A protein has these predicted regions:
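Hydrophobic/aromatic beta-strand elements that line small-molecule binding cavities or substrate pockets
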Residues: 21, 50, 76-83, 106-114
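Intrinsic-disorder/low-complexity, polar/charged segments enriched in Ser/Thr/Lys/Arg/Asp/Glu/Gln
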Residues: 18-24, 59-61, 74-76, 89, ...
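Beta-strand/loop substructures that line and gate deep hydrophobic ligand-binding cavities in soluble
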Residues: 13, 96-143
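Hydrophobic ligand-binding cavity/cleft-lining segments
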Residues: 9-59, 63-67, 155, 172-176
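A conserved amphipathic terminal alpha-helix motif
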Residues: 132-174
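Intrinsic-disorder-associated, low-complexity terminal segments enriched in Asp/Asn/His/Tyr and depleted
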Residues: 2-5
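Short beta-strands and strand-coil junctions in structured, solvent-facing domains, enriched
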Residues: 42, 69, 98-101, 129-130, ...
Length: 176
């Protein structure tokens, strides 16, 4: 039965799809958790993210451009972190309004466990769409969601392992 006072979690979204995976990150659990709360790192990892800022309410606001099949949409939305059971378990959720293209929600439940000096990061990513994007069909949306979540966590792993560095926030200088 449903508990009436329970707040809606991403697992209760309708028409959603789930995909899970796990990666091993060569860093301590605290470092991994801290990094997943770091705006610069999140911005670098979120595919198509053009802007990510923390507003006065402590919520993260994002501007993201995504191509889903033939539709290229610009989303404005917010990203929320649920840290109730951190650092072992927490969730990231984002929802964005793409105007005429419709809306998209995406999120991941993340579970961290220590493995020697490394951290195993398991995630269950979820996505839901509405409006024009939803009419593109479940298969396309599922494959796009899978691709995007994989991009996010692959990039995260590369940043954490030092394979990739964070983009500088200064305006890029022209390379001669």
């Amino acid at each position: 039965g449903h508990l009436p006072d329970q707040k809606t979690t991403i697992s209760q979204w309708e028409r959603s799809m789930e995909l899970e995976d796990e990666i091993t990150i060569p860093a301590s659990m605290d470092d991994v958790y801290e990094a997943l709360n770091d705006i610069a790192i999140l911005k670098a990892c979120i595919p198509g993210c053009e802007e990510l800022i923390r507003n006065d309410d402590g919520e993260l606001e994002a501007k993201v451009t995504l191509k889903i099949g033939p539709v290229k949409a610009k989303f404005g939305g917010r990203v929320t972190l649920d840290n109730t059971n951190a650092p072992m378990k927490f969730s990231l959720a984002g929802e964005g309004d793409g105007g005429l293209a419709g809306y998209a929600k995406g999120g991941a439940d993340v579970e961290l466990s220590a493995d020697g000096d490394s951290t195993i990061l398991k995630y269950v990513a979820k996505a839901e769409t509405g409006g024009k994007i939803a009419q593109l069909g479940g298969r396309l949306i599922t494959s796009t969601a899978r691709k995007l979540s994989k991009m996010f966590f692959t990039k995260f792993e590369k940043i954490m392992s030092g394979e990739e560095s964070l983009p500088e926030e200064e305006p890029a200088k022209a390379v001669s």
